[in-house]
Amino acid sequence: MTTQTNETIAAIATAPGRGGVGIIRVSGPKALPIAQHILGITPKPRYAHYGDFCNANGDILDQGIALYFPNPHSFTGEDVLELQGHGGPVILDMLLDAVVQAGARLARPGEFSERAFLNDKLDLAQAEAIADLIEASSQQAAKQALNSLKGEFSNKIHELVEQLIHLRMYVESAIDFPEEEIDFLSDGIVEGKLNDVIDQTDAVLAQAQQGALLRDGMKVVIAGRPNAGKSSLLNALAEKDIAIVTNIAGTTRDVLREHIHIDGMPLHIIDTAGLRDSPDHVEQIGIERAWGEIESADRILLLIDTTDNSQLDVNVHWPEFTSNAAYAKKLTVIYNKIDESGFSTTNHTSDAPYQTLPLSAKTGAGLDTLKAHLKSVMGFQSTTEGGFSARRRHIHAIEQAQNYLLTGREQLQLHTAGELLAEDLRAAQNHLSEITGAFTPDDLLGKIFSSFCIGK
């Protein structure tokens, strides 16, 4: 997919603000002439030159180190120049302006990584891993992003694609040469190979889901009546006072958010307004927002005040959750304030699809059990070695591929339908290839790279 462009791009590659070092990155056919203008010399490839950085008038703007990498041995696959000077925003802006005056244009967000992808220096999953590594919120997330950058995720996808290609060869041979004595479609060979691919796809999907959880985190919404202890639970999970806690009902009127980690698993904890009928217009707005957060939650923690015996029957008082299958499957009922009530869930067992936990947000009793529960319901394993970062689009692509594989197996088992199986295998291969960019619409590429930092 190697591409050539006549445009040379430039950007500040270091983070905004002041720092000890600031870097200007340049990529394209004019990188060497720009280096000659700025440095006053012709730099040796892959050699650190220390000297003055000057503008077109010969004015010294800064002093620092210049590195020149001729194509194709560079990050982008093009001629690349890096100017490493002092990290002041004024200095960097002046130097960037001099680079632009010498023939470059300002880069779009993610354009350096996009050129690296187009020049086959890395695939799409690796390019996305660069952004994931920068944005990692924990050590484990950073390690898995680095694994993806090194190609571990891509290699697994390539292996699946290669197996699908060989499987398609078997199937299409049986279709094209039906007179042959060996019928690959009915002798079990194709079905056996297909089952192997399905099993391996399941394994990759499980790893991708773990990687996406580390990258994106789990959205946990705390819901319940006013004064059920929602804000106290937020503070307990965050281990600091985020929300105001009082005995006055309706203290929390808006959504409060806090980002925390449990053994490396990122969580977005959201405290919401107490759910009730209220004549107060402002409180009504907060309650509407609460339901909006509940709708998009990965997990709902419904708090029940155990000091009020009239509220203990969840099915009676919260049919909005228990009778709604979409809510019930992601619902955990928290019986709070057990330090005051002496409540025990052993007296309130049921066959409900949701889990119940006793807890005291005030004293912390049951908090460790809740944390372990959250890790369990999301399938998080804090001791997992290796692994790779993944995004929701990757999971969707693998799920789509798996659906086609399962449909193809059904066609094979019921009808020995070679043509239909071949089409399902082709579709599965295309979905998997979207992950690495081997088969990707241009509009998706634009969307992915536009979310990157400028200079990356």
UniProtKB/Swiss-Prot annotation:
<feature type="binding site">
    <location>
        <begin position="227"/>
        <end position="232"/>
    </location>
    <ligand>
        <name>GTP</name>
    </ligand>
</feature>
<feature type="binding site">
    <location>
        <position position="25"/>
    </location>
    <ligand>
        <name>(6S)-5-formyl-5,6,7,8-tetrahydrofolate</name>
    </ligand>
</feature>
<feature type="binding site">
    <location>
        <begin position="271"/>
        <end position="274"/>
    </location>
    <ligand>
        <name>GTP</name>
    </ligand>
</feature>
<feature type="binding site">
    <location>
        <begin position="246"/>
        <end position="252"/>
    </location>
    <ligand>
        <name>GTP</name>
    </ligand>
</feature>
<dbReference type="GO" id="GO:0005525">
    <property type="term" value="F:GTP binding"/>
</dbReference>
<dbReference type="InterPro" id="IPR027266">
    <property type="entry name" value="TrmE/GcvT_dom1"/>
</dbReference>
<feature type="binding site">
    <location>
        <position position="456"/>
    </location>
    <ligand>
        <name>(6S)-5-formyl-5,6,7,8-tetrahydrofolate</name>
    </ligand>
</feature>
<dbReference type="GO" id="GO:0046872">
    <property type="term" value="F:metal ion binding"/>
</dbReference>
<dbReference type="Pfam" id="PF12631">
    <property type="entry name" value="MnmE_helical"/>
</dbReference>
<feature type="binding site">
    <location>
        <position position="121"/>
    </location>
    <ligand>
        <name>(6S)-5-formyl-5,6,7,8-tetrahydrofolate</name>
    </ligand>
</feature>
<protein>
    <recommendedName>
        <fullName>tRNA modification GTPase MnmE</fullName>
        <ecNumber>3.6.-.-</ecNumber>
    </recommendedName>
</protein>
<dbReference type="InterPro" id="IPR018948">
    <property type="entry name" value="GTP-bd_TrmE_N"/>
</dbReference>
<dbReference type="InterPro" id="IPR004520">
    <property type="entry name" value="GTPase_MnmE"/>
</dbReference>
<keyword id="KW-0819">tRNA processing</keyword>
<dbReference type="InterPro" id="IPR025867">
    <property type="entry name" value="MnmE_helical"/>
</dbReference>
<keyword id="KW-0378">Hydrolase</keyword>
<dbReference type="GO" id="GO:0002098">
    <property type="term" value="P:tRNA wobble uridine modification"/>
</dbReference>
<dbReference type="Pfam" id="PF01926">
    <property type="entry name" value="MMR_HSR1"/>
</dbReference>
<feature type="binding site">
    <location>
        <position position="252"/>
    </location>
    <ligand>
        <name>Mg(2+)</name>
    </ligand>
</feature>
<dbReference type="GO" id="GO:0003924">
    <property type="term" value="F:GTPase activity"/>
</dbReference>
<comment type="function">
    <text>Exhibits a very high intrinsic GTPase hydrolysis rate. Involved in the addition of a carboxymethylaminomethyl (cmnm) group at the wobble position (U34) of certain tRNAs, forming tRNA-cmnm(5)s(2)U34.</text>
</comment>
<keyword id="KW-0342">GTP-binding</keyword>
<comment type="similarity">
    <text>Belongs to the TRAFAC class TrmE-Era-EngA-EngB-Septin-like GTPase superfamily. TrmE GTPase family.</text>
</comment>
<feature type="binding site">
    <location>
        <position position="227"/>
    </location>
    <ligand>
        <name>K(+)</name>
    </ligand>
</feature>
<feature type="binding site">
    <location>
        <position position="231"/>
    </location>
    <ligand>
        <name>Mg(2+)</name>
    </ligand>
</feature>
<dbReference type="InterPro" id="IPR031168">
    <property type="entry name" value="G_TrmE"/>
</dbReference>
<keyword id="KW-0963">Cytoplasm</keyword>
<feature type="binding site">
    <location>
        <position position="82"/>
    </location>
    <ligand>
        <name>(6S)-5-formyl-5,6,7,8-tetrahydrofolate</name>
    </ligand>
</feature>
<dbReference type="InterPro" id="IPR027368">
    <property type="entry name" value="MnmE_dom2"/>
</dbReference>
<dbReference type="GO" id="GO:0030488">
    <property type="term" value="P:tRNA methylation"/>
</dbReference>
<keyword id="KW-0479">Metal-binding</keyword>
<dbReference type="Pfam" id="PF10396">
    <property type="entry name" value="TrmE_N"/>
</dbReference>
<feature type="domain" description="TrmE-type G">
    <location>
        <begin position="217"/>
        <end position="379"/>
    </location>
</feature>
<dbReference type="InterPro" id="IPR027417">
    <property type="entry name" value="P-loop_NTPase"/>
</dbReference>
<keyword id="KW-0547">Nucleotide-binding</keyword>
<feature type="binding site">
    <location>
        <position position="251"/>
    </location>
    <ligand>
        <name>K(+)</name>
    </ligand>
</feature>
<dbReference type="InterPro" id="IPR006073">
    <property type="entry name" value="GTP-bd"/>
</dbReference>
<comment type="subunit">
    <text>Homodimer. Heterotetramer of two MnmE and two MnmG subunits.</text>
</comment>
<keyword id="KW-0630">Potassium</keyword>
<dbReference type="GO" id="GO:0005829">
    <property type="term" value="C:cytosol"/>
</dbReference>
<feature type="binding site">
    <location>
        <position position="248"/>
    </location>
    <ligand>
        <name>K(+)</name>
    </ligand>
</feature>
<keyword id="KW-0460">Magnesium</keyword>
